[in-house]
Amino acid sequence: MLYYLLQYINDVFDPPGFGVVEYITFRASAAAITSLLITIFVGPRLIAYLKRKYIEPIKEEAPPEHRKKKELPTMGGTLIIFSILVSGLLWSRFNDPYVWLILLAILWMGTIGFIDDYRKVVLKIKGGLAARYKLIGQVSLGLVVGLYTWYDPAFSVLQSQTTVPFFKNLTINYGIFYIPLVVFIITAVSNAVNLTDGLDGLASGVSGIVVFALGGFAYLTGNTVYADYLNINYISGAGEVAILSMAIAMSCVGFLWFNSHPAEIIMGDTGSLALGSAIAVIALLIKQELLLPVLAGTFLLETLSVSLQVAWFKFTRWRFGEGRRIFLMAPLHHHFQLKGWAEEKIVIRFWIITLLFFLTSLMTLKLR
């Protein structure tokens, strides 16, 4: 909205300096600042409200150190979603379908997460929303995104081919596997972020780094000069994804204002599922989905720790008559908690690991 207002003022009155509104970098910075300020200033009011009604109990199976923490208000993801929506709509172009697809994903999975949180903290239903209904929501979103991008001519480049990290001239044409791939990535990434959301500031910090990186890739993808130089797919309109990505990244940073240890609020499934779906859809739209195992490596490690733990436990119970574990507890961050690591140290180290994954993903632009 502000974009169109400033554009109108520039076209009609031509005041000096207003032409910067046409620059992606300016609007991305403005969206980032707007999102950060909204989160910081709205946060205290939302926390005060949620404390009265939406307190999530500590899980019985949590590590001993985790059970010592006071019960916190959940559904903090509503703050993240609100700041993204406002800043995104203020600074993005409404005629760009990329923007609407990302916002749809955030609202879609945010709603499913909200229902899950509501059932847990208000209706006192242990486990919240049944896993099968979450899966139905994730698969449905994947089908909507996949089918829309497959049949809409504006997205014709999306399903045709994608570049492969570390290989200069290697491309993949997904063909009929494109839609199943979209469903898988959206489901996998949203679940991965949800699994990672277990310590103060962990999921929000890691998500912020990953989305910031994707915003940089989106900017390069939407610029013909950079895309040609770096030998990546040029996608017209991907620059708008960079703007929304900066809004998402800074909403995570703003949320850390209240979610860093000791947390005043947690994002709940409302936030983790919304952020996970946003990461997945952004990567798919800018054709960097094959880079996700590197860029989002922290989420991958957390997910693998759970998968390996469950698989090994079932195998050893079948083979030896008793279940055995690889980790003290899964996901991985709880393993380190039980090893005696301080919560703050675990979170900071996971952030550092995520930054290393980020830098490695940048290297793939030239290591081909």
UniProtKB/Swiss-Prot annotation:
It catalyses: UDP-N-acetyl-alpha-D-muramoyl-L-alanyl-gamma-D-glutamyl-meso-2,6-diaminopimeloyl-D-alanyl-D-alanine + di-trans,octa-cis-undecaprenyl phosphate = di-trans,octa-cis-undecaprenyl diphospho-N-acetyl-alpha-D-muramoyl-L-alanyl-D-glutamyl-meso-2,6-diaminopimeloyl-D-alanyl-D-alanine + UMP. It comes from the Bacteria. Pathway: Cell wall biogenesis; peptidoglycan biosynthesis. It is a multi-pass membrane protein. Keywords: Cell cycle, Cell division, Cell inner membrane, Cell membrane, Cell shape, Cell wall biogenesis/degradation, Magnesium, Membrane, Metal-binding, Peptidoglycan synthesis, Transferase, Transmembrane, Transmembrane helix. Pfam families: Glycos_transf_4. The chain crosses the membrane at residues 30-50, 72-92, 98-118, 135-155, 170-190, 201-221, 238-258, 265-285, 290-310, 345-365. It is found in: Cell inner membrane. CDD domains: GT_MraY. GO terms for cellular component: plasma membrane. GO terms for molecular function: metal ion binding; phospho-N-acetylmuramoyl-pentapeptide-transferase activity; UDP-N-acetylmuramoyl-L-alanyl-D-glutamyl-meso-2,6-diaminopimelyl-D-alanyl-D-alanine:undecaprenyl-phosphate transferase activity. GO terms for biological process: cell division; cell wall organization; peptidoglycan biosynthetic process; regulation of cell shape. Its cofactor is Mg(2+). Its EC number is 2.7.8.13. Catalyzes the initial step of the lipid cycle reactions in the biosynthesis of the cell wall peptidoglycan: transfers peptidoglycan precursor phospho-MurNAc-pentapeptide from UDP-MurNAc-pentapeptide onto the lipid carrier undecaprenyl phosphate, yielding undecaprenyl-pyrophosphoryl-MurNAc-pentapeptide, known as lipid I. Belongs to the glycosyltransferase 4 family. MraY subfamily. NCBIfam families: mraY. This is Phospho-N-acetylmuramoyl-pentapeptide-transferase. It comes from Prosthecochloris aestuarii (strain DSM 271 / SK 413). The lineage of its organism: Bacteria, Pseudomonadati, Chlorobiota, Chlorobiia, Chlorobiales.
